[in-house]
Every structure is written in C-alpha cells, then in structure tokens.
C-alpha cells in the first residue's frame, strides 16, 4: 500500500537511523511534494514492517556499460529510482526484502506501460547492500560500483 497516516511508523527500526528517520519524518512530506512515493508492508496492527520509495530520474548513456550504450540514444535515459528501501529488524532474513522488491518491480513495470522507463537505479549505501541487489540481477555502473541498474525490459519478460 501507499504510505499514509493510517500506518504506524513510530516503532519501525531497520537498524539504520537515516532510513528510520526518512520513514518517520520525511516520506509523507515527500509524497505531498510529488518527489517520491513510498510503499509499505505492514502487519495486522498496521505497523510498518518494511518500505521502499520510488522516484523518477534519468542517467547518462555514457554512465552505463558499453554493452548497454549501443542501443541507446545520446540524451538522458529515463529511469525509476528505488530511493529508500528497508525492512524492520524483526522481519529481516525472512524474505520480506525480496517480497518488497517484487512489489516494486511490478509497480515499475506498470509505470513503464504509461511512460518511458528504461532502467531501475539504486544507490547502495555500501558493498553489502550492493551485493543484495546484484543477487537479484542488478549490475554496477562501471565508474560507480555502488550505483546499480537493472533493465525494465528484463522485468517485463520475467513478470
């Protein structure tokens, strides 16, 4: 579901203070300003147990690997950015992260049917987070190992 005030955010703790703060203080503000949209997983008492945020963006063709560049125009390439992504510590290691990403992928495929969206981008905080995304098929940018991408076309065929 899209985050709204009906969901309890106060007790959410993913172990990362910046992500906790984003959910509790900034996510709804950013939605109100049309900067990002945050989606939540919640339990039967409407406590948020995981979330991700999506925003539109673009990347330069030249930032991508040469194998990707060949088929792309020389203007900015439209993307959807998974900006924030977290699972409460009580639910980590139980597949909640992968379930949230599957949900995000479905939303992104829906968006791609309405507007041009070539890639999903993520900006990983560290190597461990980058490894998580790589296990799901993401690739690192050649010059920025913690910025990763996945083609939307690969999702469309997989979903």
Task: For the regions a language model picked out, list residue spans one by one.
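Conserved N-terminal entry element of GNAT/NAT acetyltransferase domains
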Residues: 1-15
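Conserved acyl-donor/pantetheine-binding loop and adjacent beta-alpha core of acyl/acetyltransferases
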Residues: 51-84
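A short, internal acetyl-CoA/4′-phosphopantetheine-binding micro-motif in the GNAT/acyltransferase core
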Residues: 83-93
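Conserved active-site alpha-helix within GNAT-family acetyltransferase domains
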Residues: 109, 115-117, 123-143
């Amino acid at each position: 579901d899209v985050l709204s005030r009906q969901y309890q955010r106060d007790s959410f703790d993913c172990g990362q203070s910046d992500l906790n703060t984003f959910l509790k203080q900034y996510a709804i503000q950013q939605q109100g300003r049309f900067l990002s949209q945050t989606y939540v997983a919640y339990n039967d008492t409407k406590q948020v147990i995981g979330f991700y945020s999506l925003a539109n963006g673009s990347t330069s063709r030249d930032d991508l690997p040469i194998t990707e560049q060949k088929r792309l125009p020389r203007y900015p390439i439209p993307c959807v950015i998974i900006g924030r992504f977290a699972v409460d510590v009580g639910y980590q290691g139980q597949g909640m992260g992968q379930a949230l990403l599957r949900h995000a992928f479905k939303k992104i495929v829906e968006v791609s049917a309405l507007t041009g969206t070539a890639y999903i981008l993520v900006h990983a905080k560290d190597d461990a987070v980058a490894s998580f995304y790589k296990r799901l098929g993401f690739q690192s940018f050649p010059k920025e190992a913690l910025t990763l991408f996945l083609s939307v076309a690969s999702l469309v065929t997989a979903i």
